[in-house]
Amino acid sequence: VTSKLNGAPIPADSDSLILAMNGGKPMAPKLMYEFPRAAMNLELKRGRNFVPQFLDKTYRDIKYTRSAIHNWLAEWKPQYVVDINRDTQLQDSYADEEHILIVGVARISASQFRFKLYQYDGKEYFEIEQQDVYPNLPILFKPMGTPRPQSNYIASDADYVDYITELMGGFAIPDFLKQHRKDKKYLLLGLPLNRDSERMVMSDITYAANEHRGWFLRKNPTDKEKRFADKLGFELIEADCKDFLEQLQTRKVA
C-alpha cells in the first residue's frame, strides 16, 4: 500500500510509524521498542495534540492505493470486523453499505465509556446511542481509532493504559457487542502480537469467544506469540496475508 502522491509506503507497523512520526529518524532503542512508548515521549515533549495531528496527516490527508486484503474484505463483507489499524481502508470497503462503526477513545471526562458509536447511512456517519443501534447491520470495530468521521486515536502509553483499564472493566465494549461476540471465532490477519499492548487489547476484545477462538496467521511467530495463541485457544498457522490470498485464489480457480 503506497501513497498515490509519491509512492511512499503507508506506515503500517510500529517501526515505520515511529520513523514517520519522528521525521524519518530513529529514536532511542528503548523508545523504538513500541509505538505507544515513542508516541508518549513525543507527546510529553510537543504536547498532547502532536500525535493525533501526525495520525491525521498520515491516515486522513494522504491518499493511498488499496491493499489486496481490503479488496477481498470489500468483496466478502463479513458482518463483524475488528481492525486495529488507524487508517480508513476498512471503512472504504464498506462505503456503499450501511454499517455500525465503533471507535475507541481514551482519556475523556465527558463519559465513562471508551468508545463512540456511529451509523453510516450509505453517504455519511452520524453519532448514535447504544439503544439506537440496529443490530443487523455490519459492525466495524476500530479500537485504536480512525480519522473518520472524527479524529480519535489510542496511540500513546497514556491512551493505552486508560483504554485497556476500561476495556478490562467492560466500559470499552458496547452492550450489544458483548452479546453479539459470544461464541464467535476470529481470523487474525496481518496482526503481529509480539507486543504487550496488542496482546492485551485482543485478549479482551475476543473475550467470550468459542473455546476454539479461531486462527492466527503469522509467519515466523515469536515464542510470545506462540504462547499467546496457545493460551487463548487460537490455532496458529505459519502464513501471512499474501499466502492466504493466494490460497483463496487457488481454490477459486479450482
Residue ranges and their predicted role:
Residues 1-254:
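SIR2/sirtuin NAD+-dependent deacylase catalytic core
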